[in-house]
């Protein structure tokens, strides 16, 4: 089941999950691979990619899994670069193979493409995607790799992709999403009532020269993590900082999870 409004296409920090799965599928990256984020600042073709804690000195050397747990932009980019850096079109091809198809996407076929564009794409920029499209992808992960068309009422299920990635890598990304909630920055999404899994993100949707910047913060996940029944995406706009997908959208996600779980418990008691 899905609980979501269609919204509008936008940048999405939730892309980190998609990118990590694509990197794993390449066979060139493992969750145990180590990447050096240094002091949380990475310069690519003259453009600066930062992790959220760059002002505190960054994360240094961390694994791909640890990078996912702390929503590291640099780890995401370096994992994707290791997998597809020699041919960025292979990254786009992998996204298509996994049926991740944004409303708009800036690709290596476009004039002026650069390594910096590759980096921004890997973390959710240079594309416009509907929240419902992102939810559909996360739901496929919950569904052990089977992607289905979202339905809001009971009806026949339409399969989009029978298996978006190998079962081994689906298992890996499921584990990473669970750890994001239990051990990473997603702890505010942690429910005492049921096991959950998910990922969060933040994207700037206003121009750099605007005095007060606008952000979209997101959390997408599913529950129960060990036998999923529901997938949910929370997307919120926020003017100015602080703006955190893990804190703001993650808290709302947990409230929704607890509400549904309580209602199901009451329904079971009545029966």
Task: Give the predicted meaning of each segment.
Residues 1-12, 18-238, 266:
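Beta-lactam-recognizing serine transpeptidase/beta-lactamase-like catalytic domain environment
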Residues 158, 250-271:
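Short, gly/Ser/Thr-rich active-site loops of penicillin-recognizing serine hydrolases
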Residues 88, 249-250:
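Amphipathic alpha-helical segments in well-structured domains
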Residues 238-248:
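A short acidic/glycine-rich loop-to-helix N-cap element
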């Amino acid at each position: 089941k899905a609980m979501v409004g269609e919204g509008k296409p936008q940048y999405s920090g939730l892309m980190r999950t998609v990118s990590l799965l694509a990197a794993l599928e390449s066979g060139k990256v493992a969750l145990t691979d180590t990447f050096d984020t240094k002091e949380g600042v990475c310069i690519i073709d003259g453009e600066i990619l930062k992790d959220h804690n760059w002002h505190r000195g960054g994360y240094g050397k961390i694994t791909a899994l640890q990078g996912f747990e702390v929503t590291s932009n640099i780890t995401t980019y370096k994992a994707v670069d290791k997998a597809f850096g020699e041919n960025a079109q292979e990254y786009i091809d992998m996204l298509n193979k996994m049926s991740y198809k944004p409303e708009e996407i800036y690709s290596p076929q476009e004039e002026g493409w650069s390594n910096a564009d590759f980096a921004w794409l890997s973390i959710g920029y240079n594309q416009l995607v509907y929240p419902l499209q992102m939810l559909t992808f996360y739901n496929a992960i919950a569904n052990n790799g089977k992607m289905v068309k979202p339905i809001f009422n009971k009806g026949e299920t339409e399969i989009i992709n029978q298996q978006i990635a190998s079962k081994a890598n689906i298992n890996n990304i499921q584990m990473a999403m669970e750890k994001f909630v239990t051990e990473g920055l997603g702890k505010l999404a942690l429910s005492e009532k049921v096991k959950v899994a998910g990922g969060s993100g933040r994207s700037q949707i206003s121009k750099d020269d605007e005095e007060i910047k606008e952000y979209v913060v997101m959390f997408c996940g599913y529950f129960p993590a060990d036998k999923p029944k529901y997938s949910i995406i929370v997307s919120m706009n926020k003017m100015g900082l602080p703006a955190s997908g893990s804190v703001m959208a993650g808290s709302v996600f947990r409230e929704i999870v607890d509400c549904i779980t309580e209602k199901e418990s009451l329904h079971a008691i009545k029966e």
